[in-house]
Amino acid sequence: MLLLIKLGFIGLAIETLIVIVVWAIVYRIYREVKVEEKISQLRQRIRDRAEDSGNESDGDAEELANLLPPDRIDQDNWV
């Protein structure tokens, strides 16, 4: 009986560790998706403003440059 209780606690501890790892991975992916959505919205807003007024105002380009990694900024079509 004591052995079953010990095995139960060990199983519970292992399950808890697995749940923590899985949720950490899910949260990391969720944050990446949210950043990509924000980048897409900023790009679209910059394109719309460029079409409407011919300029990029309100610091959207700077905010987008802060969100993008440096290797993606060097590309010609980052907006």
Curated annotation (Swiss-Prot):
Residues 1-7 are extracellular. Its main location: host cell. The modification Phosphoserine is found at S53, S57. Residues 53-63 have a biased composition (Acidic residues). It is a single-pass type I membrane protein. Homopentamer. Interacts with host CD4 and BRTC; these interactions induce proteasomal degradation of CD4. Interacts with host BST2; this interaction leads to the degradation of host BST2. Interacts with host FBXW11. Interacts with host AP1M1; this interaction plays a role in the mistrafficking and subsequent degradation of host BST2. Interacts with host RANBP2; this interaction allows Vpu to down-regulate host BLM sumoylation. This is Protein Vpu. It comes from Simian immunodeficiency virus (isolate EK505). The lineage of its organism: Viruses, Riboviria, Pararnavirae, Artverviricota, Revtraviricetes.
